[in-house]
Amino acid sequence: MSGIIATYLIHDDSHNLEKKAEQIALGLTIGSWTHLPHLLQEQLKQHKGNVIHVEELAEHEHTNSYLRKKVKRGIIKIEYPLLNFSPDLPAILTTTFGKLSLDGEVKLIDLTFSDGLKKHFPGPKFGIDGIRNLLQVHDRPLLMSIFKGMIGRNIGYLKTQLRDQAIGGVDIVKDDEILFENALTPLTKRIVSGKEVLQSVYETYGHKTLYAVNVTGRTFDLKENAKRAVQAGADILLFNVFAYGLDVLQSLAEDDEIPVPIMAHPAVSGAYSASKLYGISSPLLLGKLLRYAGADFSLFPSPYGSVALEKEEALAISKYLTEDDVFFKKSFSVPSAGIHPGFVPFIIRDFGKDVVINAGGGIHGHPNGAQGGGKAFRTAIDATLQNKPLHEVDDINLHSALQIWGNPSHEVKL
C-alpha cells in the first residue's frame, strides 16, 4: 500500500453493498470507469480508488425504525492512491470523506496510512515519556485538574485556585477551554503569575505542577499567541483543535519555536463524531488523527462520568493514542467529564497507568476545598495501585469524597 485505506460503515437502501462501494471508490477518484475508452482506462488506472473489502453486517431494527426505511448495513474498505492527494490532513479528509460526508448514512470509521504517508506527520513532540520526564513521575497515573469559574474573575482568584490545586498534589492544572483572552486574566499575565505560584509551592512542598494555558485567537494569530505564551514560560498549551482544524494543530506542533507539549481539547468534536450513522468515528478523530497531528494529550469523554462515551469507543481512542508505532511517540489518554475519586479504580483498570486522571468538580467540590480534593484523588490512585479497596483506606479526604460522590468501584480488582 502506498496511499491510504478508508474504512466506512454504510447503511444502504439499495441493498447492494458491492455496488455502493464501487460507486464511492469511483466517485471520490476518477468519477467514472466502465464508459471510458480502454486507452483512457489505462491512463487513469493508477488514480482509481480500489474496493478491497466488503462485509455485510447484521440488520438493525432500531436503525431501520430511526431511518424509516430498511437498509443493509456493511463495512467497506477502499484504497486511495497517494498520487491523488497531497500528504496533508485537509487533502486526505477531503479525498476520503469530502462530498461523501453529505451522501446519506455513511460514517468514516478508520484511516490506515502507509508508512510513506506517516512520515509527513509529526506526532507528539514529547509523548508520554517526555511528559513524565518533565514531572519526574514514572510510576503512576498523572492527576490533572481544571480551573473552574474563572470567567469574570481576576488574577488573584486564579492564583488562589492554582495554589490550592498544586498543594493538593495535582500534577497538571489546565485552563477551562472557554477562558479566552480577556482584560482580567490576559494570557501572559496568567502564565507569569501562575509560574510564580507553582514555583513557590515546589519550594515549600517539593511537588511540581505544570500549567496548561489555553492558546486562543484568530487562526492566523495563533502561532504568534503560542510563541508569546512560550516566551512567558508556558509549560503546556491547551488547544481547542476542532474549532480550528487538525492541520492547525499540526502547524503548531511542527514549529520549533513552540517547544512545549500540546493538549488537545475535544470541544466541537461531538458535531463530527456523536452520530452512529454519520460523521467520523471518535477513535479516529480523538485518537489516531490527534496523535498523528501532534497532540501530546487527548481529552475525551470517559465511559463513567457526566458526558459518557461508550466504553468500547473510549478504549479504542486510547488504543490509537498509545499503541506502538515506530513513527510516533505515544500520547496521553485523558478520559474526562464527571470524574470523582470513586472512579479511579475503573480508570486504572481500563486505561492502565499511562493515563491522566482529569477532574473538575471532583476536586473543587470537596468539602476541604481543592487541596482536599487533590489529596483524595492522590490517595485513591495510591490505594488502587496497591490493589486496596477504597473503602478500606483510612484517609479523611478520600472518605469525605466517597461519602459525597459514592464508591462505584467497590468490587473492582486490577
From Swiss-Prot:
**Record: residues binding Mg(2+):** K174, D176, E177
The protein's annotated catalytic reaction(s) are: 5-methylsulfanyl-2,3-dioxopentyl phosphate = 2-hydroxy-5-methylsulfanyl-3-oxopent-1-enyl phosphate
What EC number(s) would the UniProt record show?
5.3.2.5
Q: Which GO terms describe its biological process?
A: carbon fixation; L-methionine salvage from methylthioadenosine
Report the cofactors. Answer: Mg(2+)
The UniProt entry's coiled-coil ranges are none
Listed pathway(s) = Amino-acid biosynthesis; L-methionine biosynthesis via salvage pathway; L-methionine from S-methyl-5-thio-alpha-D-ribose 1-phosphate: step 3/6
Q: Which keywords has UniProt assigned to this entry? A: Amino-acid biosynthesis, Isomerase, Magnesium, Metal-binding, Methionine biosynthesis
Concerning its family, UniProt says: Belongs to the RuBisCO large chain family. Type IV subfamily.
Subunit-structure text: Homodimer.
> This protein is called what?
2,3-diketo-5-methylthiopentyl-1-phosphate enolase
Give the source species. Bacillus cereus (strain ZK / E33L)
